[in-house]
């Protein structure tokens, strides 16, 4: 067993132990589809006034939710914009070296400044404690609403930027944020480019086939086809054939399994790194290099 596989397996085992009986979807596996969830989200952006944190109130099928976004760097309308979606249980507004924050590690905590506007979106249920987050994820409809709300917020941000700028916009995200990225493309496809990191379109398989299934409830594992019907969105993604996807997967990822999720990207320039899920998320050089290459590919 190589180190990449080891750390993924260890992470899943510890996560399952901490979750105990409160595993994903242990209360309910009933949920509208992603498309139904996205269509139902109602939200308005606050007035944008430069860099800072912008709280948003979203009306959804599961009630009012609390997404937000941070304009971390604004260089001007003559620059491209990167909209980033964080991973599971990250704290994307916590700009400290000790924080669980891939956005900060890739774009902020570096000597290599990026010539782009930087916006990071905070998904619903990520402005609370781990315990509160776990409670919310007992219900599958909360999980799908969380992703759908980030998708809708991403679209609102793009429309706002387009009012003043014709420069490229890249929608991107890692793990949880990668699913948001791909779902946005499938439904809206309004971003110039998409850079999903360690994600695909077969989201149901994460909970049913990968090592991460340790985090799934018995009720989910006993209802495979229902989970697949709700969470896999490969057919939605396939509706788009524009060559604007620049994915990255980790070869040894035990959660976002390469053999499964790479099927999402047939015909697209898939970048592969020699990592697992955990080791890939902390390989900030490889991730940053990928973003730089995407900027080059779209001509900044």
Placement of each model-derived feature along the sequence:
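Short, surface-exposed "cap/lid" segments of acyl-processing enzymes
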Residues: 62-129
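Primarily recognizes the serine-hydrolase "nucleophile elbow" in alpha/beta-hydrolase
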Residues: 158-212
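Long amphipathic N-terminal alpha/beta scaffold segment
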Residues: 36-78
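The feature captures the conserved acid-bearing segment of alpha/beta-hydrolase catalytic domains
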Residues: 206-267, 271
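C-terminal catalytic histidine-bearing segment of alpha/beta-hydrolase fold enzymes
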Residues: 266-300
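N-terminal targeting or regulatory segments adjacent to alpha/beta-hydrolase or S9 domains
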Residues: 1-54
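Short, flexible, mixed-charge acidic loops at enzyme active sites
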Residues: 128-137, 209-212
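Alpha/beta-hydrolase active-site loop
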Residues: 132-164
